[in-house]
Amino acid sequence: KINFKNIDIVEHKLNQQKYYSTEFDHLFKRCLNYIPLQKKDIITTYPVKYVIVADSDFQTALQPLIDWKTRKGFVVIEAYTDDPLVGSSNDSIHSFLKDMYDNATASNPAPTYLLIVGDDAQVPSFSGNTGSHLSDMYYCEFDGGGDFYPEMYYGRLSATNIAEVEVQVAKTLTYEKYTFNNTSFLDEIVLVAGVDASMATVYGNGQINYGTDNYFNASHALTVHNYLYGSGTPITSDMTQASAAIISD
């Protein structure tokens, strides 16, 4: 039994309505204190919002994806970096997103998804706290003061030009509409341990070995291409020829 002291029930229910999304339910159900929101019509009354932040050069190339997401029932919000309200810096884009989140209401809930379109030169990422690696997580961290828990699902189509966007949009639509000319590749899996000498031997190899022992194997009618680190496969992930072999597979 979990007891919450001095909780403001009215404020709690209001926050649920402002920030709730049916897309989060599969995560919430794993919590010990999960209580479903008692509004069965919420998905039809307030459809899920899907924000796309992109370089303005990609607007036309993105239209097929925007049309498809709209047909699926999402409310798609387009935000381009040439718009002064959006801006082209990571801070200005974060402020634009945070404003939507902070000003959410029960009748106009916060967005659920963020798709960034463009490479770092087109839509800059943030730098991680523990190194110089790039991270988009901070775009969706609004209310935790750096708690590393994003408030939205986020992803990126890393493209430097229109042609690259068109390819990624076409591939996304092919997957979502299931319009493959040949589906045999769906029975093949490529598993790569990585090239981190301090982690790959234990964690990378460990995850791959666990997966192939229990799930990804011929017993499940799957063809698996493994690239362990250091040893254990004909071509290991740290070999110079690994990149070409992985692409080929």
Each predicted region: which residue ranges?
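Cysteine-dependent hydrolase recognition
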Residues: 1-249
